[in-house]
Amino acid sequence: MDMEVLGQEQSSEQLDLEEISRKISFLDKWREIFSYHRLGTNNSTPQNHEGNHTSADENEDGTGLSQPKGQGHLPSSGLCSIPNPSIISSKLGGFPISLAMATKLRQILFGNTVHVFSYNWKKAYFRFHDPSSELAFTLEVGKGGARSIQMAVQGSIIKYLLFTRKGKDCNLGNLCEISKKEQEQALAAALAGILWAAGAAQKATICLVTEDIYVASTPDYSVDNFTERLQLFEFLEKEAAEKFIYDHLLCFRGEGSHGVILFLYSLIFSRTFERLQMDLDVTTTQLLQPNAGGFLCRQAVLNMILTGRASPNVFNGCEEGKSQETLHGVLTRSDVGYLQWGKDASEDDRLSQVGSMLKTPKLPIWLCNINGNYSILFCTNRQLLSDWKMERLFDLYFYSGQPSQKKLVRLTIDTHSHHWERDQQEEKHGPRRRFSPVEMAIRTKWSEATINWNGTVPFF
């Protein structure tokens, strides 16, 4: 009898615990939904623009999946990992975003007005490695959709530091020894240059977050408590835009700044909706694409950063599609180029092959898409692509953006080696070297190249 009473008491206690656990889970669910749509209003973490940023959600895909209104979800461990955005005064002199502008912005990005940027997009910003380190000139990049934008901007940062800033020689030492101030100047110059090119060298538009809200929720528009607080600032001179960005750089490089989203917004408004409609074609009606439960940037976004025009394709000029529709490619050579290689790509698909406009840029810097991962290749010799003799034997430097990479990788490219020398080189390092994706990407530009990793074990 005593055992039966004891068992009943234990069973009752177990049911009570299960009920409590169920209620806690229920409350946690709604707390996460509420926090997601308020951009973390319970967030009490102060901004720390110089400290380390540790992701509280290492297992999330990070590609930018957003949820329809009322269904946003973030892991509870990530609720306090993003500080509030850097907010400027509403009296700074810009003009506020309207409901019509916010609606068009959502439509051109997602194809609807319901989706919003998720946690991993919101936490993405422009942060350099430590000054005076070997990777001082490189950005720390995350995973997912924002990564491609960060790496594309990285190309423009290298362009500024190596080739366009005044008073500095084009050598690797100047890259690796830059100070914090030089990092900030490089980022401001890179962002301003990209926006100016997108504005057809006529106007740049910069978006910043203010303290006031200008757009209310409607049945057709879901608020995110971020986009609705934008002010837009227009500049008719590139230098003025660069100074403004430099003066408000914390809005792009500060932890919690949503810096990558702000830059993407600025890019779209600089290009204008009218120009974007002319740039795009029937294959691309929106700038972000669903992928593996998230959102990634379409080629049009990368081409807009590289060339100023949101061309949806990588071939030269215009081509005719399968249904005789006109497809838009790249019209002019850009300063920073583009290479791509994928293990599943078909060499017979001419529309997917990168054209010479992107393969042979004005400067020896390339954004690389290798099996869907973005990286940078560059050469410190400005004459590489303008003097054919320079292309016989030269060095390229490779930055993968992976946290495991602690220093630049120097690759020596030999385009005139004999076939038996190339075979011997490949056999020496085994089949892993022979099929390195990095090498395959390089060979889309220099097809017969022998590539020496100079002691580094081939990776990527």
UniProtKB/Swiss-Prot annotation:
Q: Which InterPro entries does the record cross-reference, listed alphabetically? A: MINDY-3/4_CD (IPR025257), MINY3/4 (IPR039785)
Matching Pfam families, A to Z?
MINDY-3_4_CD (PF13898)
- Where on the tree of life does the source sit, at the highest rank? Eukaryota
Q: Which GO terms describe its biological process?
A: protein K48-linked deubiquitination
GO MF annotations in UniProt: cysteine-type deubiquitinase activity; K48-linked deubiquitinase activity
**Stretches assigned to coiled coil:** none
Record-annotated membrane-spanning stretches: none
Q: Give the span(s) annotated as Disordered.
A: 41-76
Q: Between which residues do disulfide bridges form? A: none
Task: Say which family it is in.
Answer: Belongs to the MINDY deubiquitinase family. FAM188 subfamily.
Name-wise, this protein is Inactive ubiquitin carboxyl-terminal hydrolase MINDY-4B
